[in-house]
Each structure stands twice: as C-alpha cells, then as structure tokens.
From Swiss-Prot:
It is found in: Cytoplasm. Its main location: cytoplasm. The keyword NAD does not apply. GO terms for molecular function: GTP binding; GTPase activity; nickel cation binding. This is Urease accessory protein UreG. The gene is ureG. The lineage of its organism: Bacteria, Pseudomonadati, Pseudomonadota, Alphaproteobacteria, Hyphomicrobiales. Keywords: Chaperone, Cytoplasm, GTP-binding, Nickel insertion, Nucleotide-binding.
C-alpha cells in the first residue's frame, strides 16, 4: 500500500547515538532485494548520515539523499517538512518504481514527532545506554510512534540496565502499541521490524 503521494514513507526518529543510522542501514539491506527503497537523511549542517549509508553500501548513492536542516532539526520533520517532501519528490521522479522511502531525522529529543504529511509510519529508536528510565519518561516518540525500538540491548549488563524494567515500563507507557528490543550491531530484531513494516504498510 503506497501512500497517496507515492511510496510508503517511514519516519525514523530518536536521540543522537540511539542507532537510527544503523537501523536504516539494516532495513535497506533487508528490503532492497524485494522492494525499491530510498532514504532521506536529516542533519543540521552536514550530510554525514547520508555519506555514512553510502559507505555502508546500504543502497546505491542515487537512492540516498542528505538534507541539511539548519537550526532546529525538529522543524524539518514536523512544522515545516517542505525540505523533506521536496527530497522525496525528487527521488520519486528519478525512481518512479519506489516502494519505500525511509526518512531519518536528525538527532532529536523525546518531544520530537513526524508530521503526518511526511511519514505514513513512524519508528522511534532509543538506546539502553540512555538509562532504563527512558521509556517511563514518555514523550510523543515513546508513547505515540507506531513502533518503538529499544536498541543496544546487548550493552545492558555494562550500563547497569534491567531490560525487564524497560519492558514493563514500555508496556505501560505504550499500552497496546508495539515495541521491540534490538541489537543493530548483530542485526537482532531487524526481521521483526521488517515484518511490522510489511504488515502495517501493506507491502
């Protein structure tokens, strides 16, 4: 099921260092053989994340666009998504068979959200390294995203985090909304996220 404006648009948000780019890379590699995929990355003053995805060979460079948001990166995914919508339109023009576009936000905080005009599905990524209390702090990313990804679960013993506490708090804060624990370094959890996108996005 493509959106009215073309390909399915998946917004990936989360704080700096949570693993957004790693997730984007893994999703691209997992889906590129079956779907026509592209990426738009958001950085404040550089296109560093886009360049990183090219180096990782997530996709060919013509399928990855980096936009420089300047100032506050939240604005480019929420109040005024024009720069991202233009990037998607450009990709769609070059690649008319596009099925999925991942929109990776700049590093943001728990209050950041994607405009519904920009993203059909939203994924919010947090890391266990931020502390086991993060899920219960709430905020739109934690409570309202379509899927919450709790990443770097392998590091929990090293940062004194109890995954059972995070599981309990995420269940309470999100109510019926799904979440998944992941380890992007090893690709653990990627299959579950891909299945979620296929089901929710009608791919």
């Amino acid at each position: 099921m493509k959106s009215r404006n073309g390909p399915l648009r998946v917004g990936i948000g989360g704080p700096v260092g949570s693993g957004k780019t790693a997730l984007t890379e893994k999703l691209c590699k997992a889906m590129r053989d079956d779907y026509s995929v592209a990426v738009v990355t958001n950085d404040i003053y550089t296109t560093e994340d886009a360049e990183a995805l090219v180096r990782m060979q997530a996709l060919t460079s013509d399928r990855i666009v980096g936009v420089e948001t300047g100032g506050c990166p939240h604005t480019a995914i929420r109040e005024d998504a024009t720069i991202n919508l233009q990037a998607i339109a450009g990709l769609n023009e070059r690649l008319p068979d596009l099925d999925v576009v991942f929109i990776e936000s700049g590093g943001d905080n728990l209050a950041a959200t994607f405009s519904p005009d920009l993203a059909d599905i939203t994924i919010y990524v947090i890391s266990v390294c931020q502390g086991e209390e993060i899920p219960r702090k709430g905020g739109p990313g934690i409570t309202k995203s379509d899927l919450l990804v709790i990443n770097k679960k392998d590091l929990a013993p090293f940062v004194d985090v109890d995954l059972d506490v995070m599981d309990r708090d995420a269940t309470r804060m999100r109510q019926a909304r799904p979440f998944v624990f992941s380890d992007m370094k090893r690709g653990d959890g990627v299959g579950t996220i891909v299945d979620f996108l296929k089901e929710q996005g009608g791919l």
